Structures are given as C-alpha cells and as structure tokens.
Amino acid sequence: MNDATSGLDTLENSLLADIASAADEPAIEAVRIAAFGKKGTVSEMLKTLGAMTAEERQLKGPVINGLKNRVTEALTARKAELKDVAIAARLAAEKVDVTLPVRQSPAERGRIHPISQVIDEIAAIFGDLGFAIAEGPDIETDYYNFTALNFPEGHPAREMHDTFFFQPDEKGERKLLRTHTSPVQIRTMEKQKPPIRIVIPGKTYRQDSDATHSPMFHQVEGLVIDKTANVANMKWVLEEFCKAFFEVPSVKMRFRPSFFPFTEPSLEVDIQCDRSRPGEVRFGEGSDWMEILGCGMVHPNVLRAGGLDPDEYQGFAWGMGIDRIAMLKYGMPDLRAFFDADVRWLSHYGFRPLDMPTLFGGLSA
C-alpha cells in the first residue's frame, strides 16, 4: 500500500507541475487528456477499481478519487488564471491613453449638423412651453397623409409629379413618402385624449429640387387641442417661439389670410426683419418682412378624422421648414449644401458636440 500511495503521490506531483507550467489553454488541454483521456493515467487507475475486491476498493478508492478531484480542481483553477491573464493582456493592448491632448484642428473635431442643432433648439423652446415631442412613420398611407387632413380627391398634392408614391399593394392601396409631418396629428388624436400639446419634427418628401428646395427636407409643426384654444393663444405661442429661436427681445409679426385644407381659418405669418445688408438678415428690427410659417385653426373635418367632436374641442396648428429657418438664422445661402456631406462646410457651420441648447444656457452658445 505504501508503494502504491507513493506512486500516486509521484503522479499527482507530476500532473500538478505540468498544470502549473502550462502557458496557454492548449497546454492545459494536453495535460487534461494525459490525465483523463481514454488512456490517461488517472483514467487507467479508475478502471482498476472495478477489478478490486471490496476491501481493496474501500482502501484505494478514496485515494484514487482524491487524486482525481485535486487534479480536476487544479486544471479548473489554471484555466481561470490563464483566462484572466489573457483578458488583462487584451485590455493593456487596447488601452486608450486619456491623457493625450485633444485634437486641435477643426477638421479633426466632430461637429453637430445645423439641422440637428436647430431641431434641438426647437425642442428646448417648446419643451419650456409645455409641449411634448411626437413622431410618426416616414412611409404613410394616402389616408393619413391626405384624406384625414381634408385634402379633396383632385388636390394637386395627390398627383405623381408632387408626391413620391409606391406601387399599389395587392388590395390596390398605395403608400407614399409623407409630404408633411401633419399625419402625426391624426395619429396622436386617435390615441390620445385632449388636451394635446405636441411638436412634430421630422423628414418630409416632395418632388422639388433647387437652391432653396430639396426632395427630402425637414419640417416641424405644432398642434394644440383643447376646449378653449383660440387664435390669440396661437399668436402668443408663435411670438414666444420666434423671440426665443432668433434670440431677440421682441419681434413684430403679421398674419395674412391664406388657405390650407386642414385649417380654417388659415394664416401665413411674416416676421419683421432687416435685409438692408447684402447676405444678412436681422430679425426683430428693420422695415422688411419675411414669410416664416403657416398656421390656422384645426379644420372640423380634421378633428372628426381624429375621433374628436368639433362641437366640444378646437385647436390650432402651425408648420415651418426646419431647413429654411436654419438657413435664415445662421446665414446659409444654399439648401443643397446641407446634404453634400462636405466636412469643410460642416466644420464651418457645425456646432460643438455636447453643447445641448437650453433657454438658460443659450440656444446657440
């Protein structure tokens, strides 16, 4: 028994030494196979237990099983240790030196696109006025884009030369790229009871392209629905927005009669400005006027389409082009440059990352 025990001790010491010296997982796997493979040293010893008498098995069984358990534990521990070493080496290799100086060249620094900046500015202003942000799909149905918004069947906007239509589906229904963000008004009224106060920024699509128009452009509109909303409320909201957005203490606005299928009465809004200097527009002063947005009281048919009773609820809505007001505020002459992906243009007109616009800190600080 002493010779047998001595042999087991020698085997155990040899296996533990091999495990300790294993430098990687393949080496560990080789030791495991040498010990516990089909013809491994420990496996062969375990096979002998079946041929032993009960007395021999009682004496040698715990010794052999103890060897097996200790070698197994050593293999598991060494595998975990090697895994930790590998992770530490990888982390060291991929480490970023945060003490390195920042990139100084404007071309190397990322900039926020003016459209993203202006959307954040709009969200900050209307958020301060108690409005929520609403969104909807870019691909719309004819119903939400036109019918529910009181567009008659023969309206020019329904024609192929103005709107991007998809092929009709198997039911003959056709979808389209939305021509305005107004479908979100209907979707919101369908699932939310008044009072409703939302602004809706997003992409819109029309077949138009020149220095001031793009086939894809950005629009924002607002919607207020309750039992007492009126033109005076709308006028106040729009004045507060224009003062905050153009960062002027006061602004003069004039409202002109117009026509939109989804509002009655419909109005277009001009804002006072000074265009006496070439290539520059100053708001809140001067004797010139510039159209800035369209607005009106929500048409009763639109309220009905949204599931609301026009005898109980009323509201007002307005809309404007985000690209256009960005051009006016920041002096960008050509809308097409917004979408050219020119890093030189973006480094000139872009904004510093992480400087989120707030009314307290300054919208365009």
Curated annotation (Swiss-Prot):
Pfam families: Phe_tRNA-synt_N, tRNA-synt_2d. One of its GO terms (cellular component) is cytoplasm. It is found in: Cytoplasm. Mg(2+) binds at E264. GO terms for biological process: phenylalanyl-tRNA aminoacylation. The keyword Nucleus does not apply. Its EC number is 6.1.1.20. Binds 2 magnesium ions per tetramer. GO terms for molecular function: ATP binding; magnesium ion binding; phenylalanine-tRNA ligase activity; tRNA binding. Keywords: Aminoacyl-tRNA synthetase, ATP-binding, Cytoplasm, Ligase, Magnesium, Metal-binding, Nucleotide-binding, Protein biosynthesis. It catalyses: tRNA(Phe) + L-phenylalanine + ATP = L-phenylalanyl-tRNA(Phe) + AMP + diphosphate + H(+). It is an enzyme of class 6 (ligase). Its cofactor is Mg(2+). NCBIfam families: pheS. PANTHER family: PHENYLALANINE--TRNA LIGASE, MITOCHONDRIAL (PTHR11538:SF41), PHENYLALANYL-TRNA SYNTHETASE (PTHR11538). Tetramer of two alpha and two beta subunits. Belongs to the class-II aminoacyl-tRNA synthetase family. Phe-tRNA synthetase alpha subunit type 1 subfamily. This is Phenylalanine--tRNA ligase alpha subunit. The lineage of its organism: Bacteria, Pseudomonadati, Pseudomonadota, Alphaproteobacteria, Hyphomicrobiales. The gene is pheS.
